[in-house]
């Protein structure tokens, strides 16, 4: 029996003292500043001044942002400025841009606009000159949504780009923005793929983990240098030296004993690179005001990490789980999550059996689309600003309003889920397609065939393989006696209990204030204002009842729900396991094929 447990942790971590004796470095002691030019990527969600459909976002990068980055780079050179511009972007975007599917059309009706030959050549020349670069991760991922094989492919994407352009990149660094953390279990996988460091910039409204700005994150005997920026990616830089915004000295990574600092010239969600060379010059002036004694240079992650490596033994050590409060997105589209997991299962099995190889362009391209499923963008609110229409009847009426925020939001979610279809299309005639289709069929609810079943009395005890077991009227095991006579279940310790839970605004006020303490910008989406006032929202667990119990051979768990009505009100569906605690036994959680 496979049990998925999604753990959401926000660590108040324990740091281990290293006995470091080097003197603390102040900003006046910094002699060199490494400047990383980036902008935040949401593959979907939002765009400045237009609807953020996935297709619109990709087209904006392909037709405007990438050409603009190239132009800004060469304008500085041609005009004779000493300042340089290096644009750090994402391997998934670069790969899709260079090997662009020419006929890709999304459910919104938006067609992907591939670059023409001239734009592509200019982009490649900028790469070869070192002015366009990328970090080591595919994009802003939620790693725990993927299996080990998919995580490895995400890193492989950047390795393949490096190989394509003859780039010998040491001290490779994964960048993750918006998402406030990830699982400790990712460390061995990243180390296996040659990653030296992880850089995390937390959404400004979200509660960050209790970790220092630069530390060594350990999992057993493996570790990553980790740069952690709370309350922003950082935020976008300001307009002038007196207003630095996210380019203040407090936003930069500074390591005791090292006279180099790392600062981010960050632009916000899908804002692209600086609009022109003048904006780049302003960025340099802002940083010079923050570090008056330093040389400022556009840089890359690995250049700074190479300098931190000799100091890593003196960094604070964090050896606990961090977790990711944004993993709540996994429950926002249960069908997409089920399809995602099905695709990853089939792909992993196919690769392990040697029936699939990344040398096959079909498998490689399909894997590239599969990566998008675990990117941190699950959908969008479509611009809905509605704290009135909470009841189901009101909600259904709003769904019928043409071109409304509700209809836009539905299209956003459909578009994100559609990436599963693109993966299948990319596979063409590969044998994996039939396996995927069968997995997808298994996901879809169907009234079970009871041919090999026989009905049993719900109140009676059953025996299966020497185990004595009994179900309660809610369908949960309340007795499970093993071959040694130990009972693992009881009335207060049910196994496999389906729980349906609804919530009211009080629940969400507490949730919002805990996870999103620094801003009210997301209050409508996360806080559910006026939900209880304008509906009959209840905070309660609802009773379930078994109507019939049937027995068959073997052990399998398939939970299906028929006739479920759509609702705007928040609800939770849980499959609960609460075994009897026994001395000498403990829970193990499986993460990336490893039990912890």
Which residues does each PLM region occupy?
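Generic structural signal for alpha-helix starts
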Residues: 2, 183, 428-430
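Extracellular/luminal ectodomains of metazoan preproproteins built from arrays
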Residues: 19-21, 446-450, 591
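Catalytic-domain carbohydrate-binding cleft regions of carbohydrate-active enzymes
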Residues: 22-419, 536-596
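Catalytic and substrate-binding regions of extracellular carbohydrate-active enzymes
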Residues: 372-375, 382-563, 572
